[in-house]
Amino acid sequence: MLGIITFIIIFGILVIVHEFGHFYFAKKSGILVREFAIGMGPKIFSHVDQGGTLYTLRMLPLGGYVRMAGWGDDKTEIKTGTPASLTLNEQGFVKRINLSQSKLDPTSLPMHVTGYDLEDQLSITGLVLEETKTYKVAHDATIVEEDGTEIRIAPLDVQYQNASIGGRLITNFAGPMNNFILGIVVFILLVFLQGGMPDFSSNHVRVQENGAAAKAGLRDNDQIVAINGYKVTSWNDLTEAVDLATRDLGPSQTIKVTYKSHQRLKTVAVKPQKHAKTYTIGVKASLKTGFKDKLLGGLELAWSRAFTILNALKGLITGFSLNKLGGPVAMYDMSNQAAQNGLESVLSLMAMLSINLGIFNLIPIPALDGGKILMNIIEAIRRKPIKQETEAYITLAGVAIMVVLMIAVTWNDIMRVFF
């Protein structure tokens, strides 16, 4: 149960942060955001703000989305002869077009619609008391659809495809960007929780409780200077010296550890502990505990994880295998393991997955943010927009590829994790 809760929390945070990036910069770019949804499937909760954005919480805690005006099948169609009721503002402009028979307003003006333009001219025409009349429609007017859903109209100037190229590019990039920021922030938080960043350039050590070194008398911040005569000046020297000193070590044999404690040099016999095929002496690298060191340490961890993910992506391209990919099932399995290991493991997993999600979404495949960014760049180079039909077909092809890949990855994960 704890694994499921951890999975939902991690996945939910990653999705909210990612989609908020798209949402925020779409608004800043003048694009009307129809809906900001967390989860998929039937609505559990919904709220419409003054800007016309519908915020929804949906039943399945898997994914989420930001729906912008001008994307896909976004146009509201009103059939000729459809009965409607119009609500006018003080200037005589239509501020509400009600097509629902279940939400009637007795103060509104009844009309049978014969024509309309809610994108360019912003007008609606119809029969009012058997007389044809045309009314101007306010830029921020709303439509109550037949099922009772109220949405804002989307004039051309607030549709996605009519925003500036720069606005669209930053809107598409903002999701992955937010994932990178989240990953960096969580890694920095993790370093602070751990007390600092391991200092691999030093030979000062932290001594593990009940470990071999602790039993021999070593204490935190002691300085190991030699192991079996091998000089130690850094953590790498220490690990190599332990490896060399224990290479032919018998079951009950010890090694000599020379260390400096409170300016006094001491040599003790330490009995290494065997773990799998390697020996350890129960010490960790000392920590750099300065505020700046912690900040830089978090950035270093984030860069290290990003570099690892990029190398894995390179390996995936040169030698594709489903076993190198993981979907929601694999993510649940990792969340379950992290939950059992405590808060630091959960935070580490969240940070890694956030950076992973950011990099994955920048792959230039249609339907991913990277594919949209690529089309923005092509449009900027050509200095003319890509036809909407062409863009729609390209996106549809990308969606089909991603759906097939996701099904294959999920099936592979199920077989790997549960069987």
Curated annotation (Swiss-Prot):
What is the top-level taxon of the source organism? Bacteria
Q: Which family does the record assign?
A: Belongs to the peptidase M50B family.
Specify whether Translocase is a keyword of the entry.
no
**Name of this chain's protein:** Putative zinc metalloprotease SPy_1963/M5005_Spy1674
User: Required cofactors, per record?
Assistant: Zn(2+)
Q: Which GO terms describe its molecular function?
A: metal ion binding; metalloendopeptidase activity
Organism expressing this protein natively: Streptococcus pyogenes serotype M1
Query: What PROSITE patterns does this protein's entry cite?
Result: ZINC_PROTEASE
The organism's lineage? Bacteria, Bacillati, Bacillota, Bacilli, Lactobacillales
Instruction: Enumerate the UniProt keywords alphabetically.
Output: Cell membrane, Hydrolase, Membrane, Metal-binding, Metalloprotease, Protease, Transmembrane, Transmembrane helix, Zinc
Q: What is its EC number?
A: 3.4.24.-
Q: Which GO biological process categories is it annotated with?
A: proteolysis
Grouped into one coarse class, the protein's main location is membrane
